[in-house]
From Swiss-Prot:
Species of provenance: Shewanella frigidimarina (strain NCIMB 400)
InterPro entries noted in UniProt: 2-IPM_HCS-like, 2-isopropylmalate_synth_dimer, AIPM/Hcit_synth_CS, Aldolase_TIM, LeuA/HCS_post-cat, LeuA_allosteric_dom_sf, LeuA_bact_synth, PYR_CT
Protein name: 2-isopropylmalate synthase
Cofactors that this protein relies on: Mn(2+)
Annotated spans, Regulatory domain: 392-522
Pathway: Amino-acid biosynthesis; L-leucine biosynthesis; L-leucine from 3-methyl-2-oxobutanoate: step 1/4
Assembly information from the UniProt record: Homodimer.
PROSITE patterns cross-referenced by the UniProt entry: AIPM_HOMOCIT_SYNTH_1 (PS00815), AIPM_HOMOCIT_SYNTH_2 (PS00816), PYR_CT (PS50991)
Domain Pyruvate carboxyltransferase: 5-267
């Protein structure tokens, strides 16, 4: 049996289902490119039949990614498989992942069919998907609660039908490691054609056991683990990719298994997903939490000074978290910035040097010292800008009356290149700025969530503002970054306004198509 574990990332499919606001196509592509750099073998990037937006994002990613296999999800229905195949057809290499429920409660209560009917649907779906590709994965949804005889039968028939990967999900995070490992062991003992497929696992974290269950399965012969960055996903989340990768690396002597993950990209990828998805990483999160390499106990600190491996089983550098605290000032030249970006793993094509250096100088004049995390924050914000932004914040001035609690804000916004200046009052400077921006853009949206976080350390740290806004029953996520909280808040709102504008244009386009079809049918 191979000692290579295939890493199947589903951040952009299962992970995205946990978000309050959907990612844009551009944001999904950013994450896909980061996953490719990370070295994932397979990335599941969407459910094409679910919406035109998901179809487009799958197609865009499939067209761009070259070094990882792109996968799309489909139910055991021909229309789903058709949509997946069509969206993936532009890829160099792709996988169709089809699934159906197999547990008694799902078969009887959700599908309202007999197990034999479900078995037939599964076989037909796999055979149909094989018309488009040899790489077909089949999942037994809720396998963790499926009677073992039925599960063995389903796996055997799916392999006979042509599935080359069989996924065994613990869909509701119900099993414990000994139990889940036992399921995998039983499949290897009882399914006669098990050697013709890779056995995969997809574990959820409802009881906090997703990683432990996945490792138990791997020890019993599973050779694909489905996971997400930072463990994001439905309900309590999914198996965490970074934890699986570092378990395999750190305990190689015990497990004797490898995966193709470039561990030095873990920190960077984790931060990107956290920012784009507006999902903070808890401080004590294994591998990527801010406390993961912190030592506060005096005994621990003393041990660390004598020998780092007394209390560290891996190094921050091993996941790409550089301890180099070299600071840069406005006197630092372009070559210094370029060197620091290279040290952090960025290629020249990942950012615009002219734009980055200009922003760096502006920030250095404000802060005095600029650190690595500042540069990464600037690159992230630059990546959020769109060439076709309708609204651009040019200038803002705020006056606050501390005695009355009333603030006045004046903003100048370029709308399609034409400057518009508006002023408004509000209950505090942020509220005033938001009211002024609403006037300038002639749009009123409902802010449902506002979050402020520091990007960096000390009193001069950059402030990142994330907002979730509701407009026409759709949710949008905006982000802003500045040394001033009010400015960062204004940037976040303008970001949302541009997303809303593009959503309106798409809606108008769809409506026009609908009208043309109606006229054509008359």
């Amino acid at each position: 049996m191979s000692n290579r574990v295939i890493i199947f990332d589903t951040t952009l499919r299962d992970g995205e289902q946990a978000l309050a606001a959907s990612l844009t196509v551009k944001e999904k592509l950013q994450i896909a490119l980061a996953l490719e750099r990370l070295g994932v073998d397979v990335m599941e990037v969407g459910f094409p039949v679910s919406s035109p937006g998901d179809f487009k994002s799958v197609q865009t990613i499939a067209k761009t990614i070259k070094n990882s296999r792109v996968c799309a999800l489909s139910r055991a229905l021909e229309k789903d498989i058709d949509a997946a195949a069509q969206a993936l057809s532009v890829a160099d290499q792709f996988r169709i992942h089809t699934f159906i429920s197999t547990s008694t409660i799902h078969v009887e209560s959700k599908l309202k069919r007999s197990f034999d009917d479900v078995l037939e649907m599964a076989v037909n779906a796999v055979k149909y998907a094989r018309r488009f590709t040899d790489d077909v994965e089949f999942s037994c949804e809720d396998a963790g609660r499926t009677p073992i005889d039925n599960l063995c039968r389903m796996v055997e028939e799916a392999i006979k039908a042509g599935a080359r990967t069989i996924n065994i999900p613990d869909t509701v995070g119900y099993t414990v490691p000994s139990e889940f490992g036992g399921i995998i062991q039983t499949l290897f003992n009882r399914v006669p054609n098990i050697d013709q497929a890779v056995i995969s696992v997809h574990c959820h974290d409802d009881l906090g056991l997703s990683v432990a269950n996945s490792i138990a399965a791997v020890e019993m012969g599973a050779r694909q683990v489905e996971c997400t960055i930072n463990g994001i996903g439905e309900r309590a989340g999914n198996c965490s990719l970074e934890e699986i990768a570092m378990i395999l690396a750190t305990r190689k002597g015990l497990l004797d298994l490898d995966c193709g993950i470039n561990a030095k990209e873990i920190h960077r990828t984790s931060s990107l997903v956290s920012q784009l998805c507006n999902m903070p990483i808890q401080a004590n999160k294994a591998i990527v939490g801010t406390n993961a390499f912190s030592h506060s106990s005096g005994i621990h600190q003393d041990g660390m000074l004598k020998a780092k491996n007394t209390y560290e089983i891996m190094t921050p550098e091993s996941i790409g978290l550089n301890r180099n605290n070299l600071n840069m000032t406005s006197r630092s030249g372009r070559h210094v910035i370029k060197h620091r970006m290279e040290e952090m793993g960025y290629k020249p094509t990942d950012y615009d040097m002219d734009s980055l250096y200009e922003q760096f100088l502006t920030l250095a004049d404000k802060k005095g010292q600029v650190f690595d995390y500042d540069l990464e924050a600037l690159v992230f914000m630059e990546s959020q800008a769109q060439d076709d932004d309708k609204y651009q914040l040019q200038h803002m001035m705020v006056h606050s009356d501390s005695t009355e609690g009333v603030a006045t804000a004046t903003v100048r916004i370029a709308v399609d290149g034409k400057d518009i200046t508006e002023a408004a009052t509000g209950n505090g400077p942020v509220d005033a700025a938001y009211n002024a921006i609403a006037r300038a853009t002639d749009r009123k949206i409902n802010i449902t969530n506002y979050k402020l976080s520091a990007k960096g350390e000390g009193q001069n740290a950059l402030g990142q503002v994330d907002i979730t806004a509701k407009y026409n029953e759709q949710m949008f996520h905006g982000v802003g970054l500045a040394t001033d909280v009010v400015e960062a808040s204004a940037q976040a709102l303008v970001h949302v306004m541009n997303l809303v504008y593009r959503a309106d244009k798409v809606a108008d386009f769809k409506q026009q198509i609908h009208k043309e079809r109606e006229l054509g049918g008359v």
